[in-house]
Every structure is written in C-alpha cells, then in structure tokens.
UniProtKB/Swiss-Prot annotation:
Regions annotated as coiled coil: none
Transmembrane intervals: 77-97, 112-132, 189-209, 323-343, 368-388, 446-466, 486-506, 511-531
Designated name of the protein: Sodium-dependent phosphate transport protein 2C
UniProt topology in membrane: Multi-pass membrane protein
Expression across tissues: Expressed only in the kidney.
Extracellular side: 98-111, 210-322, 389-445, 507-510
InterPro entries: Na/Pi_transpt
Disulphide bond pairs: 276-309
Source organism per UniProt: Homo sapiens
Residue list for modification Phosphoserine: 4
UniProt record similarity statement: Belongs to the SLC34A transporter family.
GO cellular component, one term: vesicle
Gene that this sequence comes from: SLC34A3
Catalysis performed (reactions): 2 Na(+)(out) + phosphate(out) = 2 Na(+)(in) + phosphate(in)
Signal peptide location: none
Length: 599
C-alpha cells in the first residue's frame, strides 16, 4: 500500500494528542452551535441529561412518599455536611503546607538580590503560594515586607503576579478526584485549567509591560492619591466563623510567625500555638524548638498562669515537619472522601426538573440584544461569593465538581472564576484598610496592584469575545488530559514545581544566564505554536515540509509512545483510559493536507 510518509512506512495505529485536538478544532470551527461529531460519538462538552429514573410522585403511596422525603432530607444534610468537612479539610491542608514550607518561604523572601529580578520574583510568588496553599498568606508576607521597607513596591509586583498564578493549583488538585469517569474528568480538568491558563496568559502580557513601564505601580499610586482613606474595621470573616470550631480543635498556628520569619523578627521557631492567653506576668524561658529537631520548650514565653491552647497538638513534642506531614495526610484523605461523597450526592440529587432548574439559573443568558450581559453578571456573582467566603480556593474548588457532573458549563464557569480573582482582591483591600495607620498606604498599594492585575486580565481575555483564548485552550487541554490522564500529574509537576524551580535556579545564576537559556526556549515554543496554528488554519502559507510534523520522530509529536511507557510503569492502569475508548488513527498530519493523499 503506498504511503506519503517518509520511507514508505505506515506508522503503527495510534491516537495521539494532535488527532484529539484537531477533532476538537473541527467541532469548534463550525458555524452551528452544536458540535459536528463523528457517527457514534457523544459530545462531552454538552451537559449530560440527568434523567430522573425514580418512580413518579403521584404513583407513590404514603409510605413511599415519606421515604422519598426522608431520603431527600438525608441527602441534603449529607451534601451540606460533606461540603462543611470539605471546607475544613482545605483549611487544615493550608495549615499543613504552612508547617511544611513556611520557614522556607520566609527565607526565600529575605533574598532581595534575587527578588530584584522580575522573573525570579514571579517564580517565588508561584512557589510560595504552592507551598503554603494560601494566596492570602503569600500576599500578607509581601504586604508585611513592603510595610517594613524590606521590599519596594516595584519589586513586589512580580511576586503578586506569581501569587495569583499559584492559587490555581487547588482547583487542579480537586479535579483529580473525578478522574474515574472520562467525560466528567474532561469537563472538571478543563474548568481547573482555564483558571491557570488565564493567569499565565495575563502574566505573559503584563509582566514585560510592568517591567518596562511600571504601569500597575503608577495606577495604584494614582488611585491612592485620588482617594481619601481612613482606617476601617477589620474585614468580615464569614467562613472562618463556621470552620473555626472544628479546625481550631485540630491545630492552631501563630499567624504572625511567617511574617516575622520573612522580616527577620522571629522570636519563636515553632508555628504551632501552645499558649493562647495569659492571666499573669510572662516569664522568659529558653526555647530550642526547631523544624527538624526536638522541642524542649513549647514557646519562648511561658505565662505565670498558663492558659494552654486546646487542640490536638497543643502539648506535642513533635516537630513542625512531623505535624505538617500528619495533617497533610489526614486532610488529603478527608478532602478526597468529601469530594467523592459530594460528586455522588450531586449526581443523585440533580435529576430531572431539579437539574433543569439549576442549570437554567446558572447558565442562563439574557435574550437578544442583551445576551452579553449574562457573563458579566457571572463575574459579579463570582466576586460576591468569593468575598462572602473569603477564599478563592474554596469557591473554585466548589465550581470544579459542579462542572464535572454537568451542572455548570465551561463558558459559564470562566466568568465565575474571573470574578473569584476579583473577589479575593477585594478582601485584601478591606484587610489593608484595617492595617495600622503607618502601614496602611503600603498595604493598600500592594492590594490595589493585585486588583488592577486581575482587572487588566479581564479586559484582555474576556471583554472581547474573540480574545477569550483560555476557553478553547482549556478545552483542548481537557481533551488530551482525558485521553492520557497522567498528563494531569505532569501538568502539576511542570507548571507549579519543576519549571518554576528551573527558572528560579537560572535566576540565581544571574539575569544574563536566565536570558541565554530561557530566551531560545521561549522562542522555540512560540515558533512551534505559530507553525501548528498555521498548519491547521493556513497550511498553504507554509513550505511543504512544514505542513505536518510527520518528519519528526513520533515521540516528539505524539503522546502515544509516552503513554505506553507510563502504562508499563503503572500496572494498575489508573493513568490510562479503558481500552474501549481507544480509536485507531494512521496519521499525525493535518487532515486537510492528507485528504487527497492515498494511505
């Protein structure tokens, strides 16, 4: 059989990432609102019809109706209880990461020579937020250092950008709980990816612009100059009021310790609170409690009338590292269990008319000519809910499972997540207004920079519908990740750990070394993206050889060889989908080019 491939060889039948993405592109490129699918295919982006298979209410007897009502009440209580424990597990998870990484985070922030490099500042913001699992904690460190004159506002801007990127890791971790079902995982992971893609695209535009013009710094200065500011009351703490009774029985941390470590004023080497109050004069005691050594004393100050804290680790002799590992394992176990329960209960509750009503309310659009208004109302709703919860991580972690079960579409989740970015900066603004008078202006300027950064991102990637690039990119990423589930783990490791660490290491060597290595790599990636887009949209503009990637080794343009390698290393087959979902394909090139060629 003749072949157009080099060497007259037909490759082994595979389904690679290019085939999957190309199919998605063809579906999105049609003028109809319904995707064009091959025969026998189902569109995973279409919200599934959650049909009610139970017996109609009118046909039930009195006992059956009582059982139905009791079951509904129990499901509602189970859903609320699972959601409560899910939120508490996120709080404990954040405490665990702070115990494991806060000392490192504080030491990293001390190095002003490294922070003067914008790329290094960005990477440090990503790494620290990933370590402590809390954008509020990372922002508080930056605000404290700016107020203490250890950092300038200009140096803090790239760090704030990195904090914004690092906060999207939580929703990605949550989406992994739905990896058991291919379509649910595709929708859930695309929802988590759209948040990270938006943040990275905004950074790619604004970081060079800020380095050249100091745009965000000047905007924040103008806003401060035009406003009449007075200290306000402390920001509301709605969510903490609900979670504190449980989480404070597990562990309590010294919230000022991380900032003290970063500013060099640390007096106690342990983050765990052992004394929560005093009724007498304190007496000084020696402390040798370390992160990796035994604790001989709990605090550097021992009250005359001791009022010990009441939590599981109040009297522990374990190190911060050991306590952090215990909390990490326990919180992850509870988190995964609650997510499984939430997804199962949502699948059980959201049936028939209930599902239709919920979908209609969340995904509704206004009639023409006001159809564009629905997305902006979703932005406001996301900002308001995040402000009420005071946690963007909790809000995004709640949206992702709803996307997986088919309640929220990707097009509606996108503005909700953008609103969440705005909502978390509003909380920071109120917290800055509650700062002491001598620190209020510095804290407020950093909070305003965070706000303007997210607002600029919305103007860039949402205001003009044609520029809403994170949505198709997240769809394509979801297609590939659903086919090769191990890609999700690679994305987490590369996007939030390995690549930031590599960039940080190069920045330590110097700006010239970073530019010498990073410049060609970034240029190569941009060139590959440009050629790939032209292959699919305008292949006639390219030389014949560049109209496909078939001339490259298969492992450079297909994930199939890597999938076989991962499958051999993962005998439980968790990293790969069932064989029933695998289809055959005989080429990797652009189908428009090969349409007239004989294989």
């Amino acid at each position: 059989m003749p072949s157009s491939l080099p060497g007259s060889q037909v490759p082994h039948p595979t389904l690679d990432a290019v085939d999957l993405v190309e199919k998605t592109l063809r579906n999105e490129g049609t003028s109809s609102s319904a995707p064009v699918l091959e025969e026998g295919d189902t569109d995973p982006w279409t919200l599934p019809q959650l049909k009610d298979t139970s017996q109609p209410w009118k046909e039930l007897r009195v006992a059956g109706r009582l059982r139905r009502v009791a079951g509904s009440v129990l499901k509602a209580c189970g859903l609320l209880g699972s959601l409560y424990f899910f939120i508490c597990s996120l709080d404990v998870l954040s405490s665990a990461f702070q115990l494991l990484g806060s000392k490192v985070a504080g030491d990293i922030f001390k190095d002003n020579v490294v922070l003067s490099n914008p790329v290094a500042g960005l990477v440090i913001g990503v790494l620290v937020t990933a370590l402590v699992q809390s954008s509020s904690t990372s922002s508080s460190i930056v605000v404290s250092m700016v107020a203490a004159k250890l950092l300038t506002v200009r140096v803090s801007v790239p760090i704030i950008m990195g904090v914004n990127v690092g906060t999207s890791i939580t929703s990605t971790l949550v989406s992994m709980a739905q990896s058991g079902d291919r379509d649910e995982f595709q929708r859930a992971f695309s929802g988590s990816a759209v948040h990270g893609i938006f943040n990275w695209l905004t950074v790619l535009v604004l970081l060079p612009l800020e380095s050249a013009t100091a745009l965000l710094e000047r905007l924040s200065e103008l806003a401060l100059g035009a406003a009449s500011l007075t200290p306000r009351a402390q920001a509301p703490d709605i969510l903490k009021v609900l979670t504190k009774p449980l989480t404070h029985l597990i562990v309590q941390l010294d919230s000022d310790m991380i900032m003290s470590s970063a500013t060099g004023n640390a007096t106690n080497s342990s983050l765990i609170k052992h004394w929560c109050g005093t009724t007498g004069q304190p007496t000084q005691e020696n402390s040798s409690c370390g992160a990796f050594g035994p604790c001989t004393e709990k605090n550097s100050t021992a009250p005359a009338d001791r009022l010990p804290c009441r939590h599981l680790f109040a009297g522990t002799e374990l190190t911060d590292l050991a306590v952090g590992c215990i909390l990490l394992a326990g919180s992850l176990l509870v988190l995964c269990g609650c997510l499984v329960l939430i997804v199962k209960l949502l699948n059980s509750v959201l049936r028939g008319r209930v599902a239709q009503v919920v979908r209609t309310v969340i995904n509704a659009d206004f009639p023409f000519p006001l159809g564009w208004l629905g997305g902006y109302l979703a932005v406001l709703a996301g900002a308001g809910l995040t402000f009420a919860l005071q946690s963007s991580s909790v809000f995004t972690a709640a949206v992702v499972p709803l996307m997986g079960v088919g309640v929220i579409s990707l097009d509606r989740a996108y503005p909700l997540l953008l609103g969440s970015n705005i909502g978390t900066t509003t909380t920071a603004l109120l917290a800055a207004l509650a700062s002491p008078a001598d620190r209020m202006l510095s804290a407020l300027q950093v909070a305003l920079i965070h706000f303007f950064f997210n607002l600029a991102g919305i103007l860039l990637w949402y205001l003009v519908p044609a520029l809403r690039l994170p949505i198709p990119l997240a769809r394509h990423f979801g297609v590939v990740t659903a086919r090769y589930r191990w890609v999700a783990g690679v994305y987490l490791l590369l996007g939030f750990l390995l690549l930031p660490l590599a960039a940080f290491g190069l920045s330590l060597a110097g700006g010239m070394e970073l530019a010498a290595v990073g410049g060609p790599l970034v240029g190569l990636v941009l060139l590959v993206i440009l050629v790939t887009v032209l292959q699919r949209r305008r292949p006639a503009w390219l030389p014949v050889r560049l109209r496909s990637w078939a001339w490259l080794p298969v492992w450079l343009h297909s994930l199939e060889p890597w999938d076989r390698l991962v499958t051999r290393c993962c005998p439980c087959n968790v990293c790969s989908p069932p064989k029933a979902t695998t289809k055959e394909a005989y080429c990797y090139e652009n189908p428009e080019i090969l349409a007239s060629q004989q294989l």
